[in-house]
UniProtKB/Swiss-Prot annotation:
Pathway as given in its UniProt record: Protein modification; protein glycosylation
Compartment(s): Golgi apparatus membrane; Cytoplasm, Perinuclear region
GO cellular component terms given for this protein: Golgi apparatus; Golgi membrane; perinuclear region of cytoplasm
Role this protein plays: Initiates complex N-linked carbohydrate formation. Essential for the conversion of high-mannose to hybrid and complex N-glycans.
Transmembrane segments: 7-29
Record-listed substrate binding positions: 117, 144, 190, 212, 322
Name assigned to this protein: Alpha-1,3-mannosyl-glycoprotein 2-beta-N-acetylglucosaminyltransferase
Enzyme Commission numbers on file: 2.4.1.101
Segments forming a coiled coil: none
Amino acid sequence: MLKKQSAGLVLWGAIIFVGWNALLLLFFWTRPAPGRLPSDSALGDDPASLTREVIHLAEDAEAELERQRGLLQQIKEHYSLWRQRWRVPTVAPPAWPRVPGTPSPAVIPILVIACDRSTVRRCLDKLLHYRPSAEHFPIIVSQDCGHEETAQVIASYGTAVTHIRQPDLSNIAVQPDHRKFQGYYKIARHYRWALGQIFNKFKFPAAVVVEDDLEVAPDFFEYFQATYPLLKADPSLWCVSAWNDNGKEQMVDSSKPELLYRTDFFPGLGWLLLADLWAELEPKWPKAFWDDWMRRPEQRKGRACIRPEISRTMTFGRKGVSHGQFFDQHLKFIKLNQQFVPFTQLDLSYLQREAYDRDFLAQVYGAPQLQVEKVRTNDRKELGEVRVQYTSRDSFKAFAKALGVMDDLKSGVPRAGYRGIVTFQFRGRRVHLAPPETWNGYDPSWN
């Protein structure tokens, strides 16, 4: 308020100065000479008198202007002192201030992998509906397969998306026993080309990969914007995924949509990676089955991904190389989060490895151990959170099936598992399917 008042005083001083000079000039030109009244005839009869009058007026004006210059100098001096005191900007005002310590949002493209599904419209409609900024989240649709109907759907979005096309549509030479897997080879080829475009051609620092049959949650962009700095800062992480492999509605805590975990299993299905990771993977990218290849120890290198309690993507694509089998048995039951969580306003430091391992392991092994049958029949409800212990590959698979969680293992790692532990909801309470506390690593022979 004081600054506004001071600025107002300076402005009024300048206005008074200009107005005062205008009045003075008007006064000097219209006032009579000292001692007599002027008349047109007198001035016209005596040119010398006219000259003297003009000179006299000029002298008076000069004296008054000199006095006014002094006044103006005083105003300038007072303004200078006031500006130093209040640090008034002399340039255009700065941009709207950010919260201290909040970096500008990074540019993270959404790479949509498309082929021959014209239903890509459903995927793109949701992405565009929830996208908070076209500048920070450009959408790039990479199309394989040469399917014209799908191409027309993508083109209908105009400049809202960027449409690129994988140029090599030829069949891939494979061994006779792999001919039925031709689709998996083409998918791997497409991923390699599309990710190469994102990181090698467009030079983006990161990207979120989304398949054309995924629908995203309202806070999909918020989730990745918040976890991107964590992924950059923590070398023990190598991806952030929107997917929970055990995310069926009855197996998640719907009251905690903000809950995030570390997982040793690569989930895919809407995942964020950095350019540095692509530089590491591209030279050895596989010919086929790229996602299972990502789950091998030589690629994972002990690193983890972030995954949510409630998935931020949902697949609606029954059509695909797996012929709908996995979709019917599992994928279509995954719950999509509908409650917006302001992740960028939350403290996610609990996901850093040292803090997470300490707190998560204390939580799991601090929970009372209960036999799987007692969990199934909901005995000992008073215990609340419990732990079911397995000691072998076979006992893991048996207990997982009994409790309804995914029982397959990739290089020894269970889906959604971290340090061998799979955590989920069962009949309203938290259950941890866990190895003994002495666990010291995965056995790749557990497949």
